[in-house]
């Protein structure tokens, strides 16, 4: 990214960001209304505004009046369950109140649909009357048992706030260059398709000269059938947050951004809950653990 684009992108900042404005606009505005004003304010083209609004499921103008969305991910479609599911929802809510979206992350269960900020799947459609009334239902869970003994994803080293605090305290006493050296020698790679060495990435970022640095966690599982980090996001949110905090410490960044689509409400709930508790305990925000290191998360 060029220095000019970086400057333009950070001109207004995260607290008043374009995506938030688009979300507000999708609720309160008519199709196409206000595009020029937003484009001028954020110094982007009108086509960029339109492209973003038409790309994201919850921002699309044609979806504003919808009450439910049927998953059209590849697994659900191949299972052949969605046509009848959509018909049942339309009978209950009305033909014009049911839309479609990709993918809700229930590829193992099918019959997946989204209603009023929650995802449902499997036999949940049989409880549609209770769901529409707002009654709390007991959802069937897919239970698995792990016999792993060495996997960081499965262990309990960051299973609660106290362990988070103790481990963070230890890391903040380490020299940043030593953490990078350890990462480089570990051969740890990113979780993306490129498998880029984490140590190299953090090293480059720590040496980059910039007035402001951000730590970005792209938790979007945009490809149909690719909600591969669901366990990590829903059951191990502290590990995701811990990695971002340590990254901020090492590279000299004081602000992080977690990007998750609205299609995954359980992940959003788990991460928001953890972030709020960490802020209450002083483990996110200004002068963490009485040090000169500050890091906030959005």
Regions found by a protein language model. Name each.
Residues 1-298:
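Feature of Fe-S/electron-transfer and energy-metabolism proteins
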């Amino acid at each position: 990214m060029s220095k000019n684009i970086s400057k333009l992108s950070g001109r207004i900042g995260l607290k008043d960001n374009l995506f938030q404005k688009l979300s507000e606009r999708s609720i309160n505005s008519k199709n196409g209304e206000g595009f020029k004003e937003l484009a001028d304010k954020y110094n982007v083209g009108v086509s960029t505004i339109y492209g973003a609004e038409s790309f994201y499921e919850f921002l699309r103008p044609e979806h504003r009046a919808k009450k439910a969305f049927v998953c059209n991910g590849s697994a659900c479609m191949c299972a052949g369950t969605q046509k009848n599911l959509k018909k049942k929802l339309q009978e209950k809510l009305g033909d014009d109140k049911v839309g479609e979206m990709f993918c809700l992350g229930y590829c193992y269960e099918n019959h997946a649909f989204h209603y009023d900020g929650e995802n449902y799947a499997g036999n949940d459609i049989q409880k549609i009357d209770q769901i529409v009334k707002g009654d709390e239902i007991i959802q069937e869970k897919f239970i698995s048992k792990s016999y792993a003994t060495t996997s960081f994803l499965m262990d309990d080293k960051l299973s609660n706030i106290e362990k988070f605090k103790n481990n963070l305290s230890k890391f903040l006493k380490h020299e940043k260059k030593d953490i990078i050296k350890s990462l480089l020698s570990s051969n740890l790679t990113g979780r993306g398709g490129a498998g880029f060495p984490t140590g190299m990435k953090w090293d480059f970022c720590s040496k980059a000269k910039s007035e402001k640095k951000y730590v970005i966690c792209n938790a979007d599982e945009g490809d149909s059938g690719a909600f591969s980090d669901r366990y990590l996001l829903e059951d191990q949110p502290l590990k995701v947050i811990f990695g971002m905090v340590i990254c901020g410490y090492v590279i000299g960044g004081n602000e992080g951004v977690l990007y998750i689509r609205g299609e995954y409400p359980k992940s959003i709930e788990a991460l928001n809950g953890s972030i709020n508790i960490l802020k209450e305990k002083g483990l996110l925000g200004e002068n963490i653990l009485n040090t000169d290191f500050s890091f906030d998360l959005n």
